[in-house]
Amino acid sequence: MIIGITASCFDLCHAGHLEMLKYCKKHCDYLIVMLQTDPSIDRPDTKRKPIETVFERYIRLKNCKWVDEIIPYDTEKDLENALKVLEYDIRFLGEEYENKNFTGRYIPGHLEKCHFNPRKHSFSSTNLIERIKSLKEKI
């Protein structure tokens, strides 16, 4: 059995999240989703606080047919520790991380397990928020 793992905040779950989860599950038998509670905890300059609670995001992921297990985590250090302890065969990351410094990159043997999935769309939580803001201004 091939075990895959991916990590994100999954705030305002949108089409891009679903395409990514579907892609991950297509390449593994069992998919573990690491759910970040709040990325602004240790990256306040680059990440925003989630709009949805971790429980709302958990419920949505729990009901997604491509997700087999959900593990919440708080910080990037928590994620790194999980990557060191959990057993998995493939870690899925977006292709935009391939040449970047990402959590877990320097764990011995980890980079060989990384699969950088293609992003063939422009869906994002940031774009969704901007669209909602522009609609609100028109009301």
Where are these regions (language model features)?
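Nucleotidyltransferase catalytic core that binds NTPs
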Residues: 1-139
